[in-house]
Amino acid sequence: MKVQPIIMFRKIILIFLLMVQGMFASAQGQFNNWFWSLGQRITFNTNPPTVIPTAASITSFAYTTAVISSPTGVLLFYTDGKVIKDAAHNTMPNGTLNGAPNIPVTYSTGKQSALIVPDPGNSNRYYLFIVIYYNSGGTVYKDLRYCIIDMTLNSGMGDVVSTSKNVFLASDVDGQITATRQTATNNFWILTHSNTTNNFSAFL
């Protein structure tokens, strides 16, 4: 999937994409495992869904999380936008995320500030899109960035591709991201909103 900037879009498109995303998310086992703040987890691999007790020390995320599983519902990895953890709840070797080079992420927060989509051209790879907040010289930056996670790395537990980590897409963004599949090419549209204007940015 090639990521490239497209033009700004209007608010009505966001509403449409949010509805489409809901339908897409319910269609595959890739979205059967959910994590949220302070160690809470639920799986939709069972009927009815099962709440899985998880120690807060394992998933002590306080803000937004994003999770991806295999097409059969096996957990692959998850993130809060600050670190990426594998299915064994270990931080991936290259999974600590930064803002500008060597500047730690302060936090990643918002209703949906981290989003994972599969690579349409490689079933072993996934794109993680994140809105990251970091402080540099007293100024707080809010950037949209992405990483590529390759599940063939780290003995099959997955890791961030070193040449595709924290790739910058846009600045001054709000803490919300959404996505929908482009039917003609099987790629994904990624949409976010400016933090200070009424503009939307879309990427394909």
What are these regions (language model features)?
Residues 1-32:
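Bacterial Sec-dependent N-terminal signal peptides
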Residues 29-110, 118-121, 131-145, 149-160:
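Beta-propeller domains
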Residues 67, 114-116, 177-180:
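Hydrophobic core register within WD40 beta-propeller blades
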Residues 72-73, 123-126, 185-188:
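Short coil/turn segments that connect the beta-strands within blades of beta-propeller domains
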Residues 77, 128-130, 190-192:
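Conserved beta-strand element within WD40/beta-propeller blades
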Residues 114, 126, 144:
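A broad, low-specificity signal marking well-ordered, structured residues that form hydrophobic/aromatic
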